[in-house]
A protein has these predicted regions:
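Active-site T/S-Asp motif of two-component receiver
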Residues: 18-19, 45
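His-Asp phosphorelay/catalytic-motif detector in bacterial-type signaling
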Residues: 12-14, 37-42, 158
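Acidic catalytic/metal-coordinating carboxylates
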Residues: 3, 26-29, 53
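Receiver (REC) domain active-site loop signature in two-component systems and cognate sites
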Residues: 22
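Basic, amphipathic DNA-recognition helix from helix-turn-helix-like DNA-binding domains
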Residues: 32, 36, 41-102
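Acidic, metal-coordinating helix/loop segments flanking the phosphotransfer/catalytic sites
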Residues: 1-15
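Positively charged, aromatic-enriched patches within helix-turn-helix-type DNA-binding elements
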Residues: 114-186
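Residue preferences within the helical output face of two-component receiver
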Residues: 4, 57-58, 148
């Protein structure tokens, strides 16, 4: 954990695979610390397989959670998927003429990858950011859970309702005054 935080201070990293159970600084604390300054994809790879552990990992900013034992080919596929999405959205080669999107008091500066609500900066994970950007770019269009998943993860949606719902809930908690009566994100 501590080593990951230190490496990120000195080097450019495109993706992190983080274990939860580490000495001195566990993966939860390390992920929280990393999220303060970095928006890179984080995959938690852990022996902790309870639903509560997975939900905690996603709640604190991880973009994915894989339990041990795991299929190495699945891990490679997930890494490629996260990197593809991160690079596509982070690429300076693909720029639109207007990189700032607004809906009421919500503003997304896609050049800086920043989200503000009524002038206050909001920290989102890369997946949360990508979901919000997709929905704001296509205001008024209705997306199904499967369509959101397929647009963000670039893979077929099979039994992913809860994954997308958890991310939507987290976005609402961060951008809405009252998440139960959303102004911006209505699903």
């Amino acid at each position: 954990g501590i080593e990951a935080v230190e490496i990120l201070k000195k080097e450019s990293v495109d993706l992190l695979i983080m274990d939860i159970m580490m000495p001195r600084m566990d993966g939860i604390r390390a992920t929280l610390k990393i999220r303060e300054k970095h928006n890179i994809p984080i995959i938690i790879l852990s022996a902790k397989s309870e639903d509560a552990d997975k939900i905690l990992g996603l709640n604190i900013g991880a973009d994915d959670y894989i339990t041990k034992p795991f299929n190495p080919l699945e891990l490679v596929a997930r890494v490629k998927s996260h990197l593809r999405r991160y690079m596509q959205l982070g690429s300076t080669a693909i720029k639109e003429s207007e990189a700032i999107y607004t809906v009421g008091g919500l503003a997304i500066n896609d050049d800086l990858k920043e989200v503000t609500v009524d002038g206050e900066q909001v920290k989102l994970t890369p997946i949360e950011y990508n979901i919000l950007l997709l929905l704001v770019k296509h205001q008024g269009k209705v997306f199904s859970i499967d369509q959101i998943y397929e647009n963000i993860w670039n893979e077929n949606a099979v039994g992913v309702d809860n994954t997308v719902a958890v991310h939507i809930r987290h976005i609402r908690e961060k951008i809405e005054i009252n998440p139960k009566e959303p102004r911006y994100l209505k699903v």
